[in-house]
Amino acid sequence: MMSISEATVDSMIKDLPLPSNILKTLRDDVIKAGVSKKEMEEIIERVMEEYTVSCIEPCDAAGVVAAQSIGEPGTQMTMRTFHYAGVAEINVTLGLPRLIEIVDARKIPSTPMMTIALSKEHPEDYAYDREKTRALAWEIEATKIDHIADVTTDLSQMKLIIDLHEKAMEGRNITIDRVKEKFNEELNVLVSISPDIDNQIVITPGEPSYRELLQLAKSIHNVTLKGIEGIKRVVVRKEGEEYTLYTEGSALREVLQFEGVDRTRTSTNNINEIYEVLGIEAARNAIIKEATDTLREQGLTVDIRHIMLVADLMTSDGEVKQIGRHGISGEKASVFARAAFEVTVNHLLDAGMRGYVDQLQGVTENIIVGQPIRMGTGDVHLISRKAEKVVEVPPEIETAEEIEVEEG
């Protein structure tokens, strides 16, 4: 049996009315299997049959089915807010609270987190080198003064005395000059390195007042000496043969600039941040992935097409919109549909004042006015044909009723 060439495969499948991902999978599989032309024809016929069967029926209520298919498993989800997702010290919101965050398109999730994949093209790359990975983690994690020093308030001298820990500074690869420079930039006060005591910095407020000193004592704890503002903690974890970084806090744009970060595999659970940095298509994929992972973690399986429909709706206008009165539901064309969701009186009054006309195209508005909904059999118009010729019964033929009367 002679297998067909790649060119023949391409010519046989190029005009098939199938999605591109199915065509790609079909092409790769048949080339790998080395099928004959007859087998290829049978495979195409079978694939077309399966695809036709899997397509949704005309007039099906896809939106209602998707809502039910996601909502029903949602009732079985736990209310756990925090969970150590296999990583020490990194808390992540899961379960129902996380699903609500996703469909509400929250600007900032309650527990922002990043998964930073590292480059692994060569054996000496970051993904395989623990020392390089650890050094990168210190570059990304925000270093505050609390991490490397003890701060003492000297009320008699009206000064702040900072005693730096040499070992902590070595671990985070930060110098005393860097600390001094950062405080000078951020606080605009007199910062000096103690000439008598090693690793000691003295900060004097602009005005020698008790209030200024206390204010300064608060301010120095907010200065980021090194790393990215907002990344509170970075944890290194070995998965298989390679190292991965997990962060508490998210800063996708800044993290992608670092050498050693794999930009194609690094992600965050902040969907709005993905939209701002990578665009709307990436945000759509993030919604699908986050919702699917959240449901799967709870042991629930939902057909991905239901989630894809929700993600498509949330991103169809080129920006991420919530499913709520400030998003999808609040922007429906139908006045009745908007009124049925929330703030009913306001919607009806506003529509009456502006003279809006409702075309009654959707499900909700037709139910409100008592009409059949335009779904399923309600969206099909039947026309009965009249008989072309009406057969008349001759008067001489007696009916059964007349015969019974005569016999009686």
UniProtKB/Swiss-Prot annotation:
Keywords noted in UniProt: Cytoplasm, DNA-binding, DNA-directed RNA polymerase, Nucleotidyltransferase, Transcription, Transferase
E.C. no: 2.7.7.6
Q: Where in the cell is it found?
A: Cytoplasm
Q: Which SUPFAM superfamilies match?
A: beta and beta-prime subunits of DNA dependent RNA-polymerase
Taken from the UniProt entry, a GO cellular component term is: DNA-directed RNA polymerase complex
Q: CDD domains from the entry? A: RNAP_A (cd06528)
Q: Which domain of life is it from?
A: Archaea
Query: What GO biological process terms does the UniProt entry carry, in alphabetical order?
Result: DNA-templated transcription
Q: What's a Pfam family this protein contains? A: RNA_pol_Rpb1_5
What reaction gets catalysed by this protein? RNA(n) + a ribonucleoside 5'-triphosphate = RNA(n+1) + diphosphate
Principal cellular location given in the protein's record: cytoplasm
Q: Name the enzyme group at the top EC level.
A: transferase
Q: Could you tell me one molecular function GO term of this UniProt entry?
A: DNA binding
Function field: DNA-dependent RNA polymerase (RNAP) catalyzes the transcription of DNA into RNA using the four ribonucleoside triphosphates as substrates. Forms part of the jaw domain.
Q: Which family does it belong to?
A: Belongs to the RNA polymerase beta' chain family.
- Subunit note: Part of the RNA polymerase complex.
Recorded hits in PANTHER family, A to Z, give:
DNA-DIRECTED RNA POLYMERASE, DNA-DIRECTED RNA POLYMERASE III SUBUNIT RPC1
Recorded protein name is DNA-directed RNA polymerase subunit Rpo1C
Organism encoding this protein:
Methanosarcina mazei (strain ATCC BAA-159 / DSM 3647 / Goe1 / Go1 / JCM 11833 / OCM 88)
